[in-house]
């Protein structure tokens, strides 16, 4: 296949040319190729496929919201060719059997490349040795059940790749999740990463003060909604603007943009988490957190 008249986006510049494809591989970029199967791109941009490292596909018991097939179609439509699925499904991916079942299901349904994370609990630290997830995911907010500090520390000490939802639940005020809950958790994780000289990834950072505790062992991501939206939207859109962690102040979004530009934050990820309308309307405290944005993140 030959893609003609492309504007090809590279790491440092944009060039015009044609792209020759053989099977699933690009075998040439230039202007002197020929092929019986041609597509005229008409000077539109061609970019590498995005890798979204934070996605919540709803397959298993919540597949009415989305399954691996519909979710991966949304990914491809949005320019995402690889996604990493989070383990807080129903049932959660916290044991070998469920991990293998989800791997099989995604392999059958997904039209995009994918990887799976494995959920850490205080009871499964020995059982997951046989799997090779993209990362071991810790939910400090007790999404997968209450987790103790010993489990968190041992996971960071022993595992090759650890991703963390950093919010300290003891600082929650009812259903509200203040920025201090995230900052306290990030400070704790950064200290453990430095103690064991181990890389740790902080998911969906939302507060400007969290950035103050990053060190050379911390990588992090930010979502489009935390870059572009603020807590003022909660008054008008209520549950439809509810996320975990919550939308913050305008000065937080400004700090996150600065962190992205200076390299403190290395990744933009969608934190795609679709729900049915009934899950988002009504009382803000009772509505479910999450936004469906896998197919629009690049836009």
Regions found by a protein language model. Name each.
Residues 65-72, 122-131:
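Short, acidic/polar
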Residues 125-139, 143-268:
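Histidine/acidic residue-rich metal-binding segments in metalloenzymes
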Residues 32-47:
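Active-site metal-binding motif and surrounding structural segment of the metallo-beta-lactamase
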Residues 44-109:
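Metal-associated gating/positioning segment near the N- to mid-region
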Residues 56-65, 81-96, 118-124, 139-146, ...:
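Divalent metal-binding segments
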Residues 1-33:
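N-terminal metal-binding scaffold of metallo-dependent hydrolase/deaminase domains
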Residues 54, 75, 79, 114, ...:
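Conserved, mostly hydrophobic/aromatic
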Residues 286-299:
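Gly/Ser/Thr-rich active-site loops/lids in small-molecule metabolic enzymes
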